[in-house]
From Swiss-Prot:
This is Tyrosine--tRNA ligase 1. It comes from Pseudoalteromonas translucida (strain TAC 125). Pfam families: SYY_C-terminal, tRNA-synt_1b. The lineage of its organism: Bacteria, Pseudomonadati, Pseudomonadota, Gammaproteobacteria, Alteromonadales. The gene is tyrS1. It is an enzyme of class 6 (ligase). It is found in: Cytoplasm. A motif ('KMSKS' region) lies at residues 232-236. NCBIfam families: tyrS (TIGR00234).
Amino acid sequence: MTTQLLEDITHRGLVSQVSDLAQLEQLLATSQVVYCGFDPTAGSLHIGHLVPLLMLKRFNDAGHKAVALIGGATGLIGDPSFKATERSLNSKETVQGWVADLSSQVESVMNPHLSEPIQLKNNADWFSGIEVLDFFRDVGKHFSINNMINRESVKQRLQRPDQGLSFTEFSYTLLQSYDFAKLNSELGCSVQIGGNDQWGNIVSGIDLTRRLNKQTVYGLTLPLITKSDGTKFGKTEGGAIWLDPKKTSPYRFYQFWLNCDDADVYNFLRFYTFLSVKEIEAIEANDITSQQKPQAQGILAEQLTRFVHGEQGLASAQRITQLLFNGQVQTLTLAELEQLEQDGLAVHAISDAKINIAELLVKSELASSKRTARELINANAIKINGEAITDEHAQLDFPLFDRFWVMQRGKKQFRLIKLA
């Protein structure tokens, strides 16, 4: 089973570095404890965190125990690895709130898919009880400044004439290294996974665990997910795609994956789903030979929306998508309209419903001028709440739930008009 796991994640392109592949294969022949750390830098995780979360499930499916470490202490410092500038320090109260949010989120997203609940740890629980002199004596003595400043993740920052590296950030690797040693002694944790920017910290943790606990532990890093053009994947012009439905609605989340480029989608199926590599290859082959629209994006969007938001969130996202593009928006529920208001459609607020529709088309930027607006209306290219507008002098009427109108130009351009 373990050999199959390592072969599978390697075949998927999910392995960047491994501390000792041969020894790790032997170790994973029996059930192990595997952890990944997440520092609280916001009140929600985003899709950049999905690959390590999904990797924890892959290990769990292979018979291992999954641990998520929420960095209540390290989040107060900020990891400088490959960062161009120093992070802004957040207050303890803010970080504590984020720790609670992330802990709840990890459980709600992961537990429905695991054979046993994920175990959560907060490194503030042990760092808050350590005296600074004890930490320097017992942990700091095992770290060489020479090695630390020669690490590539630090060297890039030191070479920037406009940016230094504070002692606060420089000490981060000691904290993360101690996490590994602590989880090893407390839970028997033997494997740490993380992004490839964490390699230096993971290796330091392996070394510290050997020195403090006389135990051999292992690390595995995942590659930075990039698009086919080489750019970093995961953010849009509107910002991050969050896992919290209050920050990114299930509809917006679903649409993000549905709009993946053809050049990227098959790799993303390998990275983000549990479909076998053979199944993904079959989907790709069918899309290439079929004269129909590719199926891969729909499969990716369905798999991930179900994983993060459950069957109800997926059903809602699919229903909104279907109703919008079938022109049946009058049957949208209030909750679905509120998803569209949150981030699904561009919103134009009005204070009075007695407004000429041609004028509204211009104000909402669906038409460049009143003349264009009239031409669109006369060409039957404008719909409001699914009904075609044929009178250029018409005014708004019959709002959905007393305050919403969905205005549509052609097949793909929408505005949500809201009575403020």
